[in-house]
């Protein structure tokens, strides 16, 4: 009885985690809770102590506060899930046929190129107005070079939140729009991972990379055994994480590495590929544990005063403009150029303009944008305001895309209803009934609507 109850509870948890709408709202709730806990007078001190509570691993250089453990450690679960899903998509999913996925793949690139341009442009305008110095809401001034280090903050799309908005407001949209967004966001994740590895990792001693390579090879063979030795797999995964950290590469990328090395084809008569199966099992931990707790600490930054001055801070405005305007601008421009100039084709039944509401949803940054804001700025105040910009910009993008998707969904619903009505009318017009009379005469009757003519 107890085992049945546990299975039922776990099945419920998995259903909640699988719902883009519910998991997205949970993460948003934790993000807002972090902002409140860090700024309410009676919780701010306790929250700060919790965030800075240090935990060290003996015989290593790893000694971090709880907030950094969440960012560098717990978030690895999310990146492992991303790695497994990427492997599945690259092998048998939407990215396995580059020709079919060409437009959304190119749109992902365009969506990552436009936001940094707008970010630097906005920062330049503020710098020109302030004689080269940029003053943030706290009153601290920074140079253009210092603030422009955050160019990568608005480049990433949060796939969970963007799909949650789609699930909430776009019930009648064709599946091709969701598939387009899924493909675009998957490539966006891959590009964000490369961006973190290249620009936000400081390479240390080479021998750590040798250790990472050994871990990768061992993982590759362990997960291909008929009976996977899970204890050994866990040890190898942890060692890969430690070596990534010691090598100066962001340790969450260990999750992506081992995820991509997991088989995505059925083996030994299995019904589903291991990459898909492992991703399904990890999804509840990623969606309901790793991401909400990360959001709690990522937005849990203390501001001396939450005033309107925050909304006109150069870095906040730059991040907001880059996410809300830059993302859809880059995606739509690339979609138009690739179809009208490059000769590529959209999915059947889709036009470029149909993608605009979904492109606006790609301006929802959150997870990876929060992470990049923490990595790009060494100054705590600047990093905090950048993350505030991500939070506000993402919420604005969510509202805009939600309104547009709702209107688009109603339009598609009306069009589908009209087509169905016309189709039914045509079928009625074509309905013919043959009646044989007693003398052998055949009378053809045609049914139109509810009237029968002979």
From Swiss-Prot:
Location(s) in or outside the cell: Cell membrane
Gene3D superfamilies linked to this entry: Na+/H+ antiporter like domain
Predominant location: membrane
Catalyses which reaction(s): Na(+)(in) + 2 H(+)(out) = Na(+)(out) + 2 H(+)(in)
Gene Ontology CC annotation, any one: plasma membrane
Record flagged with keyword Transferase: no
Protein's membrane topology: Multi-pass membrane protein
InterPro entries assigned: Na/H_antiporter_dom_sf (IPR023171), NhaA (IPR004670)
Biological processes annotated in GO: regulation of pH
Keyword Cell membrane: yes
Keywords of this entry: Antiport, Cell membrane, Ion transport, Membrane, Sodium, Sodium transport, Transmembrane, Transmembrane helix, Transport
GO molecular function: sodium:proton antiporter activity
Domain of life, per lineage: Bacteria
Record-annotated membrane-spanning stretches: 22-42, 64-84, 106-126, 150-170, 190-210, 228-248, 284-304, 306-326, 355-375, 386-406
Coiled coil regions in record: none
Family statement: Belongs to the NhaA Na(+)/H(+) (TC 2.A.33) antiporter family.
HAMAP family according to UniProt: NhaA
Function recorded in the entry: Na(+)/H(+) antiporter that extrudes sodium in exchange for external protons.
Name of this protein: Na(+)/H(+) antiporter NhaA
